[in-house]
């Protein structure tokens, strides 16, 4: 029988919100477990590991990969329990007001409080609805860009008009032989400046969509685009195709748990990031509230606020927030260690 180990807090989702909350929960002496669906931590940043991030406070321009590594290092400061490759699909409130969370295989996690840091749910890329397209996925049909240099000196077609498609088009224009963008609408998502830049450095076809892929073996060599209104067709030769048609979101378990949602399907939360169910808190992209900052910095603030909410939920007499880290006794030994490491570095 599975051993029933009870945690103070179980965090669902290992993106920026979940990772920072894991660290902060350690600062608040909570016994914490982090459960992530992917086999790797990092959340959405895993979609842009090579992109440079500029807008996280106090952090000089840093790649997504470096930020993930730093977040993971910080999250593991207090030795939390981390479970990867587990999709939480059900939350049950027990008569003693604790929660049991079940993963897809039926494994249970026992916890006194829950934090939903599940972003937009399990992202499932919208695939091309063209028969046989999947055979090119092993070679030059991509649904995300995790490594820029594989597109160096290539003729790349990007299909899609969202934020990510615009960003990738601009970045690839610096290294690829040619970047062509097709989109079924004339308008593109993302910052106006980025869209303008994309228009000046790539060839754009709107309103067009991919109608046919032509390949030999497992590689696409050309693509037929069709005009969305007239059906007029044009063929272009390519070395790689990137499709970014958005993601299907799996938010079903939030609905099944009976949590109050805003109209757009995201979680309604109180000022201390508690959901409509006592003991279930939330942080990051999964929440909506007035003043929402849907950025990594916003996820950090919401994470710390939610952990403080959890602490007071479990112990109403607890301080409202953790004692500042610069003067926190918890770090005394670690600070000594850091000083010694720095001195040793200077000596070498
Ligand atoms: C292309 C792109 C570029 C961006 N650039 C920037 C930028 O420059 N600066 C910036 O501040 N922000 C940027 N963002 C936004 C930023 O990435 C998000 O705001 C941030 O990742 C939100 O963090 P999160 O932890 O709330 O959610 P996520 O990062 O989405 O993480 C949620 C995690 O929860 C997991 N999960 C979900 N449901 C379950 C479940 N049921 N069971 C187990 N695990 C589950 C998911 O697998 C995922 O790992 C960008 C976003 C994109 C898409």
From Swiss-Prot:
> Which key words are in the record?
FAD, Flavoprotein, NADP, Oxidoreductase
Q: Identify which top EC class this enzyme belongs to.
A: oxidoreductase
A single Gene Ontology molecular function, please?
NADP binding
Q: Which cofactor does it need?
A: FAD
The record lists the catalysed reaction(s) as:
2 reduced [2Fe-2S]-[ferredoxin] + NADP(+) + H(+) = 2 oxidized [2Fe-2S]-[ferredoxin] + NADPH
Alphabetized SUPFAM superfamilies for the sequence = FAD/NAD(P)-binding domain
* Cofactor binding remark: Binds 1 FAD per subunit.
Protein name per the record: Ferredoxin--NADP reductase 1
